[in-house]
Amino acid sequence: MPADLTVTSKHDGSTIQVNGRRIGVAKGYALVVLDPETGDVRSHETFNTSWYREDSERLARFIAALPGGAPVVVASEFDVSRMLTAEAVAALGSLGLAEDLRGRFNVLHAAIGVKGAARGTALEAVHQDAATVTIGAPQFRIVELNGLELR
């Protein structure tokens, strides 16, 4: 993979980090397509497959249009399950992802795959609370401050 990548999926505040550049994630699935030679971001889209069946259909079309060999970073935020279609799951499978989140409300998904890869070959994590996958050495460490008390 020509880029340092960190994908963190959380219920509120998921992020994709590509060579130190943070890309925010809105509710649903976010996909970031990379240039296979340079690792530069070619495009990124968000699909709210929790609320809109049309976004599942749009996700499937988006993935179908990608060229073979394109690296794709996937993150979820909040929920992706309620309107996720079989076609969208199959499209994600064409990136090497194995997990099917239909019927798994509020489960989080983080993955790094390649268009045309065999199902189950992507780097992938699924968890109820937070899911993270990393390739390479992230250039910046993110510190999350959960509380601060001044006296």
Regions found by a protein language model. Give the residues of each.
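Short acidic-hydrophobic catalytic motif
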Residues: 1-71, 76-151
